[in-house]
Amino acid sequence: MPSTNGNDPCDEIRIARNVGTVRCGVSLHAPVTLEELASEFGLRSIKFDEIDSRAGHALAQKILHADLAHAKEVMSKARASELSDEFLKLFGPKARFFTNGNFHQTPRSMSGFTWTPATSATFDTGILIVSGEHCGCLWVEDED
């Protein structure tokens, strides 16, 4: 689906987040199970936790803004917000969001973030998106 400037939002995301690996796209199939959606984007079949829309949007912005390994800025917060909003609007206001950890939260202790790996990367997280018409994925992988 085209963005406002004629480019695919996922292409723009991949260009702007020029570190690690980015898995981004809209499913080629009608709404499916989370397991099938994860598989379509090359993710392992794990337990994905549902998060609310606000957390889903915040996580999308966070993983575009900085890398997972060292929290180094990859792009400005404004650009990350713009790109994540552009991608997520493809799914509408009733979209549901699923993730593999707590990267969307502020760490409550020195132990930091926890997650269940969905790839073989050292660090990975993102969102699987399910809506009435489309499903999709925005997932990043980083190495230490």
Where are these regions (language model features)?
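Short, surface-exposed coil-to-beta transition loops
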Residues: 120-125
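Glycine-rich, aromatic-bearing surface loops/beta-hairpins
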Residues: 126, 131-141
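N-terminal domain-onset segments
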Residues: 1-119
